[in-house]
Amino acid sequence: MSIDTIVAIATPPGRGGVGIVRISGPKAYAIALCLNGNKALQPRLATFCSLYKGNNEVLDQGLVLYFKGPHSFTGEDIIEIQAHGSPVVLDLLIKESIAAGARLARPGEFSERAFLNDKIDLIQAEAIADLIQASSDTAARMALKSLQGDFSKKINQLNEELIYLRMYVEAAIDFPEEEIDFLNDGNVSQLLQRIIGRLEEIRSQANQGVLLREGLSLVIAGRPNAGKSTLINNLAGRDVAIVTEIAGTTRDIMREHILLDDIPLHIIDTAGLRDSDDLVEKEGIKRAWQELKRADCVLLVVDINNRDQQNSLLNELRLTLPNKIPIITVYNKIDTTKLTAKCDEHTVYLSAKTGEGLDELKKVIKQVVGYQPTEGQFLARRRHLQALDEAKALLLTGQSQLTNHKAGELLAEDLRLAHQTLCEITGEFTSDDLLGKIFSSFCIGK
C-alpha cells in the first residue's frame, strides 16, 4: 500500500446538485474525522454529517462514506464525501484535506493504486477511462465488459495454454533421455497451432473493440468538382462544406464526426488534387496529401462523366500511400446518367446529390475496414493489437523453428517471449513508462 494519502474531486468540473471528493490512503479516515467534527464512521455506510473548516466553521452538509481497505476500489482506506456541487465548497474540502495530511492526486492515480494493489488488471484500468469516454451505447457496453474482465479472461486463458506448452517443451529439453522425442511429437505442433488459432480469434475481436473505441479516419479525395464536399454533407446529414460549381472551392481541410453503426467516423474533406499555381490552393493540396497518408481508409471520388480522372489519380494514390490503407473508388453523379446505385468490394456507384447509393457506400466502408458487429465483445486499444500481433509473430517463428529446424531451444525462447508479450496486455509484465502513459490520460478523480 502507498505511504501517502491522496485527494481529488471525482465529479466533472462545474456546478451541480452533488459533488464528490475522494480520499484514499492510510490517513483517509483521520482526515474524514477532521472534516466531520470527529463523527465516527462505519464501513460501507453513508453517514450524514456537517463538514467543517479547520476553525470549526461549518462549510457544508453532506454524506460521508467509508470503505475500509483492502475491501475498496484502491485496496486502501477510502473516504467519499458527497457534498453540494459548488466548485467553491469542493475546493474548500480539498484544501482542508490537504491541510490535514493529504496531497492532490495525479491524473488516474486512484485507478493506478487499484492496479498496483491487484484490485484490477491493466485492461480493466483502461476500461474505466474508456467507459467514461464512450461515444456510443455499444462502446459503453463493450467497455463495461472489459471492466468486468471479459477481455482479461481471454488473455489469461490463452496464457494458461501457452504456459502448459512451455512446460512441455522445456521439460523435454531438460530430460532428453526420455523415450519420447518431443520434436517429432505431433502434440506440440497441435498445441501450438491451437494457440495461434485462439490468438487470431481474440485479435479479430479486439480489432472490433478498437474500431468502436477509436473510430475510423476516412479521407475523401479526388479531382476538383468531383463532388467531395457534397458527399461529406450527405454523410454528415447537414451542410458542413461549401458546394459550388467553381473548381477548387475547398482549399483547406474540413472535418466532421459522425457515428456509422456505432463506429466513430472521422470524415476529412480535402482540396481537389491537381496541379495549381495558386499559393493558397497549393497549401490545401499539400495538407490533403498529409491527411491521406494518415488515413485509415480513403474514398476516391470520381465524376462518372470523367472516368479518365480515375486511373491516373488511383495510380498516384497507390504509389504514394502505404499499402495498408484501403482505397474505395466512388463513382459520383449517377443522377446525370442512366446508371443505378451499386457496389462491389472496393467500388461504389452513387449520387452524392440525391443520396442514392449512400447505404451501399456505408456497407462497403464497414466491409473494407473489417467491422463485424457480431464479433465485438469487448473494447480494446491499439497497444493490445500490437501486442497480439507481436505474440503471433513470435509463435509463427517458433512454429518454423520446430517444423524446419527441430530447434527445441529456439522454440522455447519464442514461447517465453510470446508469453511475456501477452502478459504486457494485462499488466503482469509492464514497464513503468507504459503505466505512466496510460494512467496520466485519466481524469484526476479516477
UniProtKB/Swiss-Prot annotation:
Superkingdom of source: Bacteria
GO cellular component: cytosol
Cofactor note as given: Binds 1 potassium ion per subunit.
Keywords of this entry: Cytoplasm, GTP-binding, Hydrolase, Magnesium, Metal-binding, Nucleotide-binding, Potassium, tRNA processing
Amino-acid positions noted as binding Mg(2+) in the UniProt annotation, renumbered to this chain: S229, T250
UniProt: K(+) binding residues: N225, T244, I246, T249
Protein's cellular compartments: Cytoplasm
Cofactor(s) it depends on: K(+)
GO BP annotations, alphabetical order: tRNA methylation; tRNA wobble uridine modification
UniProt xrefs under InterPro entries: G_TrmE, GTP-bd, GTP-bd_TrmE_N, GTPase_MnmE, MnmE_dom2, MnmE_helical, P-loop_NTPase, Small_GTP-bd
Annotated positions binding (6S)-5-formyl-5,6,7,8-tetrahydrofolate: R22, E80, K119, K446
EC number: 3.6.-.-
Similarity comment: family membership: Belongs to the TRAFAC class TrmE-Era-EngA-EngB-Septin-like GTPase superfamily. TrmE GTPase family.
Subunit-structure text: Homodimer. Heterotetramer of two MnmE and two MnmG subunits.
Function: Exhibits a very high intrinsic GTPase hydrolysis rate. Involved in the addition of a carboxymethylaminomethyl (cmnm) group at the wobble position (U34) of certain tRNAs, forming tRNA-cmnm(5)s(2)U34.
Descriptive protein name: tRNA modification GTPase MnmE
Organism from which the protein derives: Legionella pneumophila (strain Paris)
Gene this chain is encoded by: mnmE
